[in-house]
Regions:
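Carbohydrate-binding surfaces of carbohydrate-active enzymes
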Residues: 43-46, 61-62, 75, 93, ...
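Aromatic-lined ligand-binding clefts that engage carbohydrates, nucleic acids, or primary amines
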Residues: 873-899, 926-930
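Acidic/aromatic-lined carbohydrate-recognition and catalytic surfaces
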Residues: 81-205, 214-215, 225, 234-235, ...
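Extended acidic/polar, glycine-enriched regions
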Residues: 186-266, 764-809, 813, 921-923
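Short acidic/polar inter-strand loop motif in beta-rich domains
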Residues: 230, 786-788, 931-939
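Bacterial Sec-dependent N-terminal signal peptides
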Residues: 1-24
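Short hydrophobic beta-strand segments in globular cytosolic domains
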Residues: 903-904
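Mature N-terminal segment immediately following signal peptide/propeptide cleavage
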Residues: 31-75
Length: 971
C-alpha cells in the first residue's frame, strides 16, 4: 500500500543455488472434514503489526501475541515505524527512534519466544519503514538512476567542451555512462525532437571531462548520460539516521542488507524457520527517474540483442519511473523523442530493468533467505516489468487491496496467475487496506474483501493492520493508529484494534477466513483457460465496472471518496485493451470457466499436452485465449505457432498482432511475427468461432446466465476438486451447475462460516442446484470417494442433521408478515461536544418507529453505540413449517433474542435467522440489537471541533442502524 501513502508524504549474494531449507513452509495440505471444521492456526489470517519504533514493552508484546492467537490470527508481520505524531512525553522520541539496537532485538526475541508458545508465525518487514535500507547502506549502494545533461554545440568548433553534468541529482559520485551528439529537428511542447540517423556515440572520445565535437550547424546537442545515486532514504524509519535505501539492482548490496538485519549480532538465527518465517518487502515504487545499474548496458546487449547507448534519449521521461515526480509535476512529456517507434525502445529498457530486478533482488533475496530456512514475501509490482515472472521469483508473491489503485480482479490476478504459473503454493494479500477509508471497515465489508481476494487466487490474508496498544499524549481514547493522522492528512484502513467496536466480530471473520484459506491451500490451483497478457504494466485506471469494492468504496453505504489524485502514468494502449476485456471475463464467469493470465516467458516455455491442452511447468490448461492483441513478442509468436501445429487449442477474439514490441531489427521482427501469426491462425486447433468457449469440456459448468458468480478451483491429490463460488451481487441467486466428469460420485457443499458439510445429489442430468445468498460464498467438493470423517457423523445424527440443514431459500418461502414498527432504545447517546466520550451521553427511547438508515434520523445520525429494537407481536405458527426471520439491510452487526432466548448473531449478509425453535403460539417478544460502526461518531467529533478528526467533518456519513425491511417467512 505504500504507493498512495508515499504520495501523500511526498506532497506534505546472489549466492549459488543451494538446497532450500525454506521449503519446509510449503507442506502439502490434504483435505479432511475434521481439519476443515477446525483447521490449524497456520491457515488463519496474519496481521501487519505496527510498532511505534522501539517504544514497546516485553510484557505488552507477549500479551498481544497471546491475544492474536485467541483472535484466530495465525501470524504477525512486525513493522516498526516512526509515524507517531504528535510525539509528546519525556524520552518518547528517543525510545521510538531506537530501532536496530540491542534493546530492539531483545524485544524481537521475546516476541519469538511468545510466538512459539502460542503457535504463531512471525514475519519481519525488511528493516523499518520502506524501502529497505539504513545506515549500513552507503550512497554508492543506493538505487541508481540515469540522468542527463544537455549542452548546445557550435558549428566548426574544434575546441574541447565540457561534458554537461546531470541536470537533476548531480553528485560527486556520479559516473559517466555515455556521451552522444544528436541533431535537434524541433520541439513538441517540452520534448526535444532528435534525428535518429544523426546520433553519434562519442563516449570513447571523452578525455578529462571534455570532448571536441565538430558539427555543421547550430542544431546539434551534446547529451551526456550519468549514473547517479537517487538519494532515496527509507521512509518512516524508526532511527535518527535513516541512511540510504539499498540498491535493489545489486545482489551484493541486497545480501549486505540481509546480513545486517538478520546477522549474528541480532540473535535471530535460532528463530529462523521457527517461528520466523519470512522477510517482507513492499512494492517497488522508488525515487529513481530512470532505473539503472552497473550491469545495465551489458545485460541489455545480451538480452535485447543490440547496443542501447545511441537510443538512451528516448528513455528520459521524468515521472515515468519516479511517481513522486509525477505527483509533483503531472502531465510531463518525454525529454527527447526520435519517432513513432520510441515506445519499443522504452519497452526494451523496461524489460531489461525487469530482468535485473529479478536477477539481483528477487532471486538474490530468495536464495539468501531460503538457504537459512526463511522465505521472501514481497509485492512484485511497482515498475513496468514482467509482473507474473517476478511473482514466480518470490517465495511468497503478494498483492494488496489497493493494487494498481483500483484493486480490480484483473489486477489481483496478475500476481496469483504468476504464482500459479511458477508453482508458488502461497499467494498472500495485504488485505483491507483502502485509501481514504479509515474507520469504514465493517464485518460485512471485511467478509466481501475476503471473498474477493480468495476468489482472485489468494490463500494467505495479511490484515492491514494492527497497531501496538499505545496511548501517547495527544491521541484519542482509541489510542495510536498510524494510518489515520489529521495533521499529515494520512487516511487508510483498517483499524484492527481492541479499541475497534467490531473487534469481537473480527474474530468471526478470522474464523471464516481460516477455514476458507485451509480449503484454498488444499491441492493445487486449476484454471481452465489462459488469457495472454502482452504488457509490462497494469493500467491504474482500468477496472471492471461490475466489480464490487473498487478502491474499497461501497456506493450508497459509505461517503463518496475524494477525487482520485494519484496521477498515474497510463498508456492508452494498455488502458483501452483492459477496458475491452471485461466483457470477455464476464462471459467466462457466466460459463463457470476459471481463468488466469499468462506472460510471454511462460508461453515460450510451454509444451503441447494431450487433448489440445497446454502444459506450463506441469500445469495443464484447456486452451489459450488471444484477445485483440496490439503486439506479441516474436519468440512468443513462434512458440505459439509450434504449439498450434501440435494441436494446442487456441481461441482468437478480435485482431491478431501484426507487430512485436522490441526495437531490435524491428522491421524484420514484425514481418516474422506476422508470418508466425498468419500460419498459426490457419491451423485447425486455432479458432475465431465466438462459440468456441462452449465446446470446452469443463469438470463443472455453470448453466445459469450469471456473471456475478466468481469462482476459483483447486484440484486435490486424489483428483477431487474444490471450487469456491462467490455471489458478488446483493441479491439471492439460484445457480445450476452441471457435473461433466463421471468419476465424481460424492458431492458436498462446504460452509466456511460454521464448518458444516452438506451432501448434495445431482439430478438425472447430472446438475446441482444451489441458492446463493447476497454476497455469500460456498465451496463445492466433488470427489470419487466419500469425504473422510463425514460418513460416521452423517449416519449417527441423520435425523437431527435433517432439521439442522434446512436452509432459507426465498424461492421456496412464503411471506408471513412484515414488521415495520419497532421500539428503539440507545443506552448512552453522545450529544454535543461530549460525543468524544460516549459515557457522557444520555439514554434515548423511541416508540413505534419505522425502520430507517440512521443517516435519515436527526437523533441517531451520529450515534456510535448499540441500539435495541423491540417488538411484541402475535404469530400464527404451523408446526410442520420452518420459520425464518429476515432482518433485511443491517448496518452492521445484529444479535437476536426471541422470548428471552438467545437466537444468535449475524455479522454479515444474509441477516437471516432460523427462528423455528424459538417461536411460540400467540405473542412473541422479538429483540434485535444492532451495533453500528464508529465512523459517524468520529465525524461528529470533527464537527464539534476535535482537531484529531477535523478532516472527517466534511466527508459525509455512513449508513448505520437497522434499515430493514424485517420480515417473517414460512418454508
Amino acid at each position: 500500500m505504500k504507493t498512495f501513502f508515499s504520495l501523500i508524504l511526498a506532497c506534505a549474494t546472489l549466492s549459488a543455488p543451494v538446497q532450500s531449507l525454506g521449503s519446509r513452509w510449503f507442506h502439502a495440505t490434504a483435505f479432511t472434514a475434521q481439519d476443515f471444521q477446525s483447521p490449524s492456526l497456520e491457515y488463519a489470517p496474519f496481521t501487519r503489526w505496527w510498532w511505534p519504533g522501539n517504544d514497546v514493552t516485553t510484557e505488552e508484546l507477549k500479551r498481544e501475541v497471546a491475544l492474536f492467537a485467541q483472535q484466530h490470527i495465525g501470524g504477525a508481520e512486525i513493522q516498526p515505524m516512526s509515524l507517531v505524531m504528535p510525539c509528546k512525553g519525556k524520552g518518547r522520541a528517543d525510545r521510538i527512534m531506537s530501532f536496530d539496537t540491542p534493546d530492539y532485538y531483545q524485544h524481537l526475541s521475546a516476541v519469538m519466544d511468545a510466538a512459539q508458545q502460542n503457535g504463531l508465525i512471525v514475519d519481519l518487514t525488511d528493516g523499518s519503514g520502506w524501502p529497505a535500507g539504513g545506515t549500513h547502506i552507503s550512497e554508492q549502494e543506493n538505487n541508481q538512476t540515469l540522468e542527463v545533461g544537455v549542452a548546445d554545440l557550435k558549428p566548426s568548433h574544434y575546441i574541447p567542451v565540457d561534458i554537461p553534468h546531470a541536470q537533476r541529482g548531480d553528485r560527486p559520485s556520479a559516473k559517466l555512462v555515455a556521451v552522444l551528439v544528436a541533431k535537434m529537428t524541433g520541439t513538441e511542447g517540452t520534448t526535444l525532437l532528435l534525428d535518429k540517423s544523426s546520433v553519434r556515440d562519442i563516449t570513447a572520445s571523452v578525455k578529462d571531462g571534455k570532448v571536441a565535437v565538430p558539427v555543421k550547424s547550430n542544431d546539434y546537442k551534446l547529451i551526456a548520460f550519468w549514473q547517479v545515486a537517487d538519494m532515496e532514504r527509507p521512509m518512516l524509519m524508526a532511527s535518527r539516521d535513516a541512511g540510504f535505501a539499498m540498491n535493489h539492482f545489486d545482489s551484493t548490496v541486497v545480501a549486505k542488507n540481509y546480513d545486517h538485519f538478520l546477522g549474528s549480532r541480532t540473535g535471530l538465527g535460532k528463530y529462523m524457520g521457527h517461528p520466523l518465517r519470512a522477510l517482507f518487502n513492499d512494492s517497488y515504487e522508488f525515487r529513481a527517474d530512470r532505473h539503472f545499474s552497473d550491469d545495465f548496458i551489458k545485460t541489455f546487449r545480451q538480452n535485447r540483442g543490440y547496443d542501447p547507448m545511441p537510443y538512451l534519449p528516448a528513455n528520459i521521461w521524468y515521472g515515468y519511473n519516479n511517481m513522486y515526480d509525477r505527483m509533483a509535476h503531472p502531465g510531463q512529456q518525454p525529454s527527447f523523442a526520435f519517432d513513432a517507434n520510441d515506445w519499443r525502445l522504452r519497452y526494451d529498457y523496461d524489460l531489461t530493468i525487469s530482468d535485473l530486478l529479478r536477477r539481483h533482488f528477487l532471486n538474490g533475496s530468495r536464495h539468501w533467505l531460503e538457504s537459512r530456512g526463511m522465505l521472501h514475501r514481497t509485492q512484485t509490482y511497482g515498475l513496468n516489468m514482467d509482473i507474473m515472472g517476478a511473482a514466480g521469483d518470490a517465495s511468497i508473491p503478494e498483492m494488496e487491496t489497493m493494487i494498481f489503485a483500483k484493486a480490480s480482479e484483473g489486477g489481483m490476478k496478475m500476481i496469483s496467475s504468476g504464482a500459479h504459473l511458477y508453482n508458488r503454493p502461497i499467494v498472500s494479500c495485504e488485505t483491507a487496506v483502502y485509501f481514504g477509508r479509515a474507520f469504514l471497515t465493517t464485518p460485512q465489508k471485511l467478509k466481501m474483501t475476503v471473498d474477493k481476494v480468495l476468489s482472485s487466487g489468494v490463500n494467505q490474508i495479511v490484515w492491514h493492520g494492527t497497531p501496538y496498544s499505545y496511548f501517547p499524549d495527544g491521541y484519542p481514547k482509541e489510542g495510536w493508529y498510524p494510518f489515520f493522522n489529521n495533521a499529515l492528512d494520512v487516511n487508510f484502513s483498517t483499524f484492527f484494534s481492541e479499541k475497534n467496536p467490531f473487534w469481537p466480530e473480527f474474530r468471526d471473520i478470522n474464523i471464516y477466513a481460516q477455514r476458507a484459506q485451509y480449503l484454498m491451500r488444499c491441492g493445487k490451483p486449476q484454471a481452465d483457460v489462459l488469457i495472454y497478457y502482452p504488457f509490462l504494466k497494469f493500467s491504474e485506471d482500468a477496472y471492471n465496472p461490475r466489480e464490487l469494492l473498487i478502491s474499497g468504496y461501497l456506493p450508497n453505504v459509505e461517503p463518496e471518496p475524494a477525487k482520485d489524485d494519484s496521477r498515474p502514468f497510463n498508456s492508452d494502449t494498455e488502458s483501452n485493451w483492459l477496458k475491452q476485456i471485461w466483457t470477455l471475463i464476464d462471459e467466462l464467469n457466466r460459463k463457470g470457466i476459471t481463468w488466469d493470465w499468462v506472460n510471454d516467458e511462460s508461453l515460450q516455455s510451454a509444451t503441447a499436452a494431450n487433448e489440445g491442452n497446454i502444459n506450463i511447468r506441469g500445469n495443464q490448461y484447456k486452451g489459450l485465449i488471444l484477445f485483440h492483441l496490439p503486439y506479441m513478442q516474436l519468440n512468443t509468436a513462434k512458440a505459439l505457432d509450434k504449439l498450434a501445429q501440435q494441436g494446442t487449442r487456441m481461441i482468437t477474439i478480435g485482431d491478431l498482432p501484426q507487430q512485436q514490441p522490441s526495437y531490435h531489427e524491428w522491421q524484420q521482427a514484425d514481418k516474422e511475427t506476422r508470418q508466425a501469426i498468419t500460419t498459426l491462425a490457419a491451423l485447425p486447433s486455432v479458432t475465431a468461432d465466438p462459440h468456441a468457449l462452449d465446446s470446452l469440456h469443463l469438470p463443472l459448468q455453470s448453466m445459469t446466465d450469471l456473471d456475478c458468480i466468481k469462482q476459483t478451483r483447486r484440484v486435490l491429490a486424489d483428483g477431487s476438486i474444490l471450487q469456491m463460488y462467490w455471489n458478488e451481487s446483493k441479491k439471492w441467486r439460484q445457480q445450476t451447475i452441471q457435473v461433466n466428469d463421471n468419476k465424481f460420485r460424492f458431492f458436498y457443499w462446504l460452509n466456511a462460516e460454521d464448518g458444516s458439510m452438506t451432501p448434495a445429489k445431482p439430478d438425472v442430468v447430472h446438475c446441482l442446484e444451489h441458492a446463493f445468498a447476497p454476497l455469500a460464498s460456498a465451496f463445492l467438493l466433488c470427489s470419487p470417494q466419500p469425504a473422510d470423517n463425514l460418513m460416521d457423523t452423517a449416519e449417527k445424527g441423520k435425523k437431527q442433521r435433517k432439521k439442522e440443514t434446512v436452509a432459507f431459500n426465498p424461492a421456496q418461502a412464503t411471506l408471513v408478515m412484515d414488521m415495520p414498527q419497532w421500539d428503539l432504545q440507545v443506552d448512552s447517546l453522545p450529544t454535543g461536544k461530549s460525543s468524544a466520550d460516549a459515557s457522557a451521553g444520555k439514554s434515548l427511547s423511541l416508540d413505534h418507529q419505522s425502520l430507517k438508515d440512521w443517516r435519515a434520523d436527526s437523533l441517531l445520525r451520529y450515534n456510535g453505540q448499540p441500539c435495541t429494537y423491540t417488538l411484541l407481536t402475535k404469530i400464527k405458527r404451523n408446526r410442520s413449517k420452518h420459520y425464518f426471520l429476515d432482518l433485511g439491510q443491517v448496518y452492521y452487526m445484529a444479535s437476536l433474542t426471541i422470548n428471552g432466548q438467545n437466537v444468535g448473531k449475524r455479522v454479515y449478509a444474509p441477516y437471516v435467522f432460523d427462528v423455528t425453535p424459538y417461536l411460540r403460539k400467540g405473542h412473541n417478544m422479538i429483540v434485535i440489537t444492532v451495533k453500528p460502526s464508529m465512523y459517524n461518531e468520529l465525524v461528529k467529533r470533527g464537527i464539534d471541533g476535535n482537531r484529531l478528526f477535523k478532516r472527517l467533518k466534511d466527508t459525509g456519513i455512513a449508513a448505520e442502524g437497522l434499515a430493514g425491511p424485517v420480515r417473517l417467512y414460512e418454508q
